[in-house]
Amino acid sequence: MSFTDDQSPVAEQNKKTPSEGHWFAVQVASGCEKRVKLNLEQRIHTLDVADRILQVEIPKTPIVKIRKDGARVQGEEKIFPGYVLIRMIMDDDAWQVVKNTPHVINFVGSEQKRHYGRGRGHVLPMPLSHGEVERIFRHVDEQEPVVKIDMEIGDHIMVLSGPFKDFEGDVIEVSPERSKLKALLSIFGRETPVELEFTQVEKQN
């Protein structure tokens, strides 16, 4: 049997597949990761393929955002923007369900040349290796919250607390991993580099 352009190219994948399936990466439209996950989970049950499409994940890492007023806001950030990970037992039906989900672009894999005619060939979905899967989910499980701040070198700031309260200066260094920055403050008429906590400063427009 040969496949047309609108059919699945995954016949080669119908080999020995463990009952727990393999993980595949799927490229999706930017900003549509959550929408794809929800749509796909609904389609899995509607189209009765829950025995083959087993899990849909958007790997995320915890972050702490420092707002301009110094408030800390807990949140999450996608590790692989534009991608969704799917654990599945690959066959033609499961491939079609994923591929035809709105905002899905394609599986990550190797492009197969067409045997005839013009145009691009099919992408043969390639499962992630055990090592890749282990690294991804270990990163998710063990990751300490990353501190994000709406601040960069060159920004003008005002100090909100501490001995330099009400001083203003320009940021010359940002250290997110330490939740600190350095700014040049005018002290006794001289510009002096001072290290400050993120929570001690406010960005000035």
Swiss-Prot record:
One Pfam assignment: NusG
TM region(s), chain numbering: none
Keywords: Transcription, Transcription antitermination, Transcription regulation, Transcription termination
Sequence ranges assigned to domain KOW in this UniProt record: 154-178
Keyword Transcription regulation: yes
GO cellular component: cytosol
Coiled-coil residue spans: none
Leader peptide range in chain numbering: none
BP term (GO), one: regulation of DNA-templated transcription elongation
InterPro entries: KOW, NGN, NGN-like_dom, NGN_dom_sf, NusG-like, Rib_uL2_dom2, Transcrpt_antiterm_NusG, Transcrpt_antiterm_NusG_bac_CS
Keyword Ubl conjugation part of the UniProt annotation: no
Family as reported in the entry's similarity comment: Belongs to the NusG family.
Functional summary from the UniProt entry: Participates in transcription elongation, termination and antitermination.
Protein's UniProt name: Transcription termination/antitermination protein NusG
Organism: Synechocystis sp. (strain ATCC 27184 / PCC 6803 / Kazusa)
